[in-house]
């Protein structure tokens, strides 16, 4: 695949997004620590996601919101990302302050989660749940930029860092599902509060930029006009636009399942424990993909991974339309490894190969904005009446 930018940092081979650095370029004795702290943050952050994605609709339903109101509360943060996520990413790239913005977002999520427990009724819940979801979503592209920095400087394996987030999601899903069966939907909020606290701690433990690049980033930080010009140049390239459309469509196909999947399965008589287990099965499949991607898929191109994700999504959601029994839901959930995992890996690999490092965070945010903002928000909003 040709690079849109001739000046972009050295690309990587295969899905194991590894940098082509020499031994002289690498910084000794710090790469492992860098990767461990990023992995720790992924694990903490995904405690929030492990409640927010599958079980926030269950909590909203328990607070008496209608299906349309649940869809709106879930969709509004996606829409707000259109402005907030790119703006934060541009400032983070301009200032070289991804870590600082992550810390601020983590504290905002913690404060919103504290307030949410006292909210009742559609408007008060929307006023607090939307900032909570937005803060949680804003953290993802910022920490992805930090992870990609580790890939480029220390030749770290992105999948090995990211899989700890997926494992955290699995464990939390199992705990929340079982706890809801015993104690009701309010249990979800308590675990999410713990998740926000852990995320605050992990955010403060995130690594600073590698020493070899910190001074360079400070002295040669791109002007906002330079970042804007680079981003506009990307949008003029058909390959970048095709990437955004493909990745966004594949990710948005999950919208109705994320919003109403748990509620629909409960209506079918599936227990909370089994709902948590089904989510766990899907994410474990994703973990397995991340774990082997660096060795098994190293020769695959980003577009191949995106095509695999899209094809699996067509099969998965077509079968889901017939309300399959539990024994069919289990293998269907295994397809999550492709519908989400392969799509996401393809997107991360595309960014690592095709864009300059100076706008990496901004492009990560653009991907998140279009995939998890425009496309996911529209699909989520539409799922309410359906």
Describe each model-derived feature in a short phrase.
Residues 25-78, 239-278, 344:
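Helix-loop boundary and gating motifs at the non-cytosolic
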Residues 83-97, 180-181, 288-302:
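Helix-to-loop junctions at the C-terminal end of transmembrane segments
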Residues 43, 112-116, 122-141, 146, ...:
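Hydrophobic core of transmembrane alpha-helices in multi-pass small-molecule transporters
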Residues 187-205:
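Symmetry-related core transmembrane helices of the 12-TM Major Facilitator Superfamily/SLC fold
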Residues 67-68, 152-164, 272-273, 355-368:
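Loop-to-transmembrane helix entry/capping segments in MFS-fold secondary transporters
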Residues 100-114, 304-319:
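Structural signature of the two symmetry-related core transmembrane helices
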Residues 137-152, 342-356:
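Intracellular juxtamembrane helix-capping segments at the cytosolic ends
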Residues 21-33, 207-246:
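Juxtamembrane intracellular "pre-TM" segments in multi-pass secondary transporters
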């Amino acid at each position: 695949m040709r690079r849109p930018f001739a000046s972009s940092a050295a690309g990587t081979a295969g899905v194991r997004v590894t940098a082509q650095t020499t031994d002289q370029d690498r910084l000794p004795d710090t790469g492992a620590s860098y990767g461990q702290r990023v992995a720790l943050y992924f694990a903490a952050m995904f405690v929030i996601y492990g409640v927010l994605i599958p079980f926030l609709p269950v909590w909203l339903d328990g607070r008496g919101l209608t299906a349309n109101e649940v869809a709106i509360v879930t969709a509004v943060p996606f829409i707000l990302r259109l402005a907030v996520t790119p703006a934060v990413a541009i400032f983070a790239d301009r200032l070289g302050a991804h870590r600082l913005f992550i810390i601020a977002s983590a504290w905002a999520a913690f404060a919103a989660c504290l307030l949410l427990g006292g909210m009742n009724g559609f408007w008060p819940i929307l006023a607090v749940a939307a900032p909570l979801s937005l803060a949680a979503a804003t953290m993802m592209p910022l920490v992805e930029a930090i992870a990609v920095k580790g890939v480029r400087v220390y030749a770290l394996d992105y999948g090995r860092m990211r899989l700890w987030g997926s494992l955290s999601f699995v464990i939390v899903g199992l705990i929340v599902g079982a706890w809801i069966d015993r104690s009701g939907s309010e249990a979800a909020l308590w675990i999410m509060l713990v998740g926000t606290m852990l995320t605050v701690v992990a955010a403060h433990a995130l690594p600073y930029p590698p020493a070899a690049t910190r001074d360079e980033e400070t002295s040669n930080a791109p002007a906002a006009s330079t970042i804007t010009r680079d981003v506009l140049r990307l949008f003029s390239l058909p390959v970048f636009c095709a990437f955004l459309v493909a990745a966004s469509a594949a990710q948005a196909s999950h919208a109705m399942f994320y919003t109403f999947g748990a509620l629909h399965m409960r209506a079918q008589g599936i227990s909370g424990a089994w709902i948590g287990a089904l989510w766990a099965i899907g994410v474990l499949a994703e973990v397995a993909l991340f774990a082997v991607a660096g060795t098994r898929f190293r020769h695959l191109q980003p577009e191949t991974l995106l095509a695999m994700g899209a094809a699996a999504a067509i099969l998965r959601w077509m079968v889901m339309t017939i309300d399959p029994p539990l024994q069919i839901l289990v293998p269907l959930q295994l397809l999550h490894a492709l519908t989400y995992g392969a799509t996401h890996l393809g997107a991360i690999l595309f960014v690592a190969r095709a864009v300059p490092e100076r706008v990496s965070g901004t492009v990560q945010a653009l991907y998140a904005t279009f995939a998890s903002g425009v496309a996911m928000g529209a699909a989520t909003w539409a799922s309410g009446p359906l």
